[in-house]
């Protein structure tokens, strides 16, 4: 089973006011078939942690590794999905999805075949030739997800991928993410500001403190696995235990913020 690990990582930035610690001694891991969700106030280091896992920046101290091999930069084993889909408007849907494969030297027929496969997975079959300005925000985010999946990474790293969507589209996308996770068995690291979303999607939930970001709580949750075994989202969300956990986490986050 593939495993992406951060071990005792800290990130310190220089500023005019002196050293600023964004993350302090954070250890966590994401394995195949897991959804690890990071939740915390703005500025607590969630995106910095994702940046370390993606290889976009090195930690000031500590270590990031995949299966014991140090991460030295971005890699095809880690697909990244951002809140801003960052699609290329001069390319159509299938060319956006296949772009990374094109950069890897994969031939046109092979990369388009793979792109069609992942477009079917994210329920966008039939939209291959559409321009980016012809599709909705939710569809654009699905194109971004398909692009991340095209290289068949072991891990998906997702930085508030649903944050800019309206409430109904967001609910549909939550279900789609669970469907993709169930179908692929990939390890997922996801950042969100939505407590409800975190409770639904996480197999492990990490609570980060306000700056400097530290993991102050870890919660093992089973709602995503219940969905994977066939229970509808509506049934899961109507479970009193779901509501109880949701409210307890809101209270915990409020306490963390008030203590700053």
UniProtKB/Swiss-Prot annotation:
Give one GO term, molecular function aspect: ABC-type taurine transporter transporter activity
Return the GO cellular component terms, semicolon-separated.
Answer: plasma membrane
Reaction equation(s) it catalyzes: taurine(out) + ATP + H2O = taurine(in) + ADP + phosphate + H(+)
This protein's UniProt keywords: ATP-binding, Cell inner membrane, Cell membrane, Membrane, Nucleotide-binding, Translocase, Transport
Q: Where in the cell is it found?
A: Cell inner membrane
Q: Where is the ABC transporter domain?
A: 6-235
Return any one Pfam family short name: ABC_tran
Query: Top enzyme class of this protein?
Result: translocase
Q: Does the keyword Nucleotide-binding apply?
A: yes
Residues binding ATP are: 40-47
**Entry membrane topology:** Peripheral membrane protein
Q: What is its EC number?
A: 7.6.2.7
- InterPro entries per the record? AAA+_ATPase, ABC_transporter-like_ATP-bd, ABC_transporter-like_CS, ABC_transporter_ATP-bind, P-loop_NTPase
Subunit notes for this chain? The complex is composed of two ATP-binding proteins (TauB), two transmembrane proteins (TauC) and a solute-binding protein (TauA).
Family according to the record: Belongs to the ABC transporter superfamily. Taurine importer (TC 3.A.1.17.1) family.
The task this protein performs is described as:
Part of the ABC transporter complex TauABC involved in taurine import. Responsible for energy coupling to the transport system.
Name of the protein: Taurine import ATP-binding protein TauB
Source organism per entry reads Burkholderia pseudomallei (strain K96243)
